[in-house]
Amino acid sequence: IALPKMPLHLLVVDLGKDKDTPLMLKSLQRSFPCCDDDCGRRVHSWLGEENQQRVADAVKAVRAGDAETLGALMTAAQKDFDRCATPECPSQFKAPTLHAVLGDETLAELCWGGKGIGCGGEGSAQLVCRDEAARDSAARYVREELGMWCCGVDVGGS
């Protein structure tokens, strides 16, 4: 992937909670290679064609250095994840801490959007910040007010 000339400023947040990754993956894998109910068909479609399109759109946003679009795509991806995955394993995918971070008003002012990382749940979140100063402010807020560990990551730039 060609990296943008202007960096994208991301913040990775460790939610500091436990999750059962094997259970989460097992619940999603039941929809493959074929599925026999509406919930499974939603997961199958979401992890197939829908996800391919979203990833292609995200690659375009990264190449263009378009943080606002990337943030919106991440937010939309999380909403789709919630719609499709949560019914498969509510105990793991409801993720109240993740959703509290993603819905935090202070972070919303500093970030274009975000989503969970990996197979979801209460592991980590990634946020696309509006700029470097916003990322630094978001990191300070996450550490001092939310009491969570976080790490800034720049993608691209020279």
Regions inferred by a protein language model and the residue ranges of each:
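C-terminal nucleotide
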Residues: 1-116, 126-158
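A short, basic/aromatic helix-end/turn motif that makes direct DNA contacts
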Residues: 119
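Active-site pocket scaffolds in enzymes
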Residues: 122
